[in-house]
Amino acid sequence: CFAEGGAGEDLAFETVKEHLRALVVPGKTLVQLSGGEPTVRDDLPQIVAAAKEAGCQYVQLNTNGIRLAEDEGYVRSLAEAGLSFVFMQFDGMDDGIYRALRGRDLLGVKRQAIDNCARHNLGVTLVPTLVPQVNTQDIGNIIRFAVSQSPAVRGVHFQPVSYFGRI
């Protein structure tokens, strides 16, 4: 993704529904909602429900987790709409890592997001962006944390940073 990729307008909800109806093969389609930060959309639970109604077998969310931590009602709405799984940005077990990569302390936020997802039976996969000399030394701690949070945390997907495109 490109953090400075420029602003654009989100698709209208009705347009999203049209795309889902056109593209989904009932019972065989998995949709992952991502791009920018999907949880800035108040209608995301309705989009999840529309994907399920169109026949999506699995609906996944790729998120930074901030709104999931701050708004448990939103998490409940996503779960009730049929969200299957959450892939959450999770860069390490030390706020210094978050300050270096994200500009602020976020470890407590990430933990709260996991707790809120667990309360609503949403599985979470942690997604660390690995940056040499920033958080690669924390890989073992991330794995140990993931194991300690089972069954809520169900996996870790490491993404090595790649410097290309717009910076």
Which residues make up each language-model segment?
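A C-terminal junction/extension of Radical SAM enzymes
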Residues: 162-167
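Canonical Radical SAM [4Fe-4S] cluster-binding loop centered on the CxxxCxxC motif
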Residues: 1-14
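Radical SAM/AdoMet-radical enzyme domain recognition
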Residues: 17-34, 41-160
